[in-house]
Regions:
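Short, conserved acidic/polar surface loops in the N-terminal third of protein domains
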Residues: 43-44, 74
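Conserved beta-strand and immediately adjacent loop positions that scaffold enzyme active sites
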Residues: 86
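Short glycine-rich or small-residue beta-strand-to-loop segments that form or flank ligand, phosphate
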Residues: 29-35
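Short beta-alpha junction loops
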Residues: 65-69
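Histidine-anchored nucleotide/phosphate-binding helix
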Residues: 45-49
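General small-molecule cofactor/ligand-binding pocket signal
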Residues: 60-64
Length: 151
């Protein structure tokens, strides 16, 4: 939670991301499945919260604990796993329009590449943390803009 606070304080939305929030379809809803221990959530939740604020009420977000909502989580698996965070985007009629998560595509590819190498698999957490530190939530912002465009 300290990481979430720190990232929230220094986060600056790109103009394009702020505009995407402002131009989101009214009634857009995000159900975000997460857990407090999740490192990927610590990186993405500040961005999602900032976009919700920037949307002036066009996007309404709710965070749900994954482990208390496994029936929902099991409808949005990533490669067969309950990977989080997972954003489920709904329209004003509560129909699913899209989903996103658990991390940006580039980071997901990095994790898969590292985990597939037995000599490097134990370093995946450290390597992912370095990637996030270098990227500074830019990929998350790009992919959240894409998510909003599918509303």
């Amino acid at each position: 939670q300290q990481r979430v606070r720190r990232l929230s304080q220094r986060l600056r939305l790109e103009a394009e991301t702020e505009a995407a929030g402002l131009n989101a379809k009214p009634g857009t809803k995000w159900l975000i499945l997460s857990e407090t221990w999740c490192g990927d959530a610590a990186q993405s939740l500040p961005v999602l919260a900032a976009v919700e604020r920037a949307s002036n009420g066009r996007i309404e977000a709710r965070v749900l604990y994954r482990d208390e909502n496994l029936d929902l989580m099991d409808q949005f698996l990533t490669n067969g796993g309950r990977s989080i965070p997972k954003v489920i985007q709904l329209d004003g009629s509560f129909a699913v329009t899209s989903d996103w998560g658990p991390r940006p595509a580039e980071a997901q590819e990095l994790v898969q590449r590292i985990k597939s190498d037995p000599e490097r698999a134990h370093t995946y957490s450290e390597e992912l943390h370095k990637w996030y530190a270098t990227d500074r939530q830019q990929a998350i912002q790009r992919e959240v803009r894409e998510l909003i465009s599918r509303a």
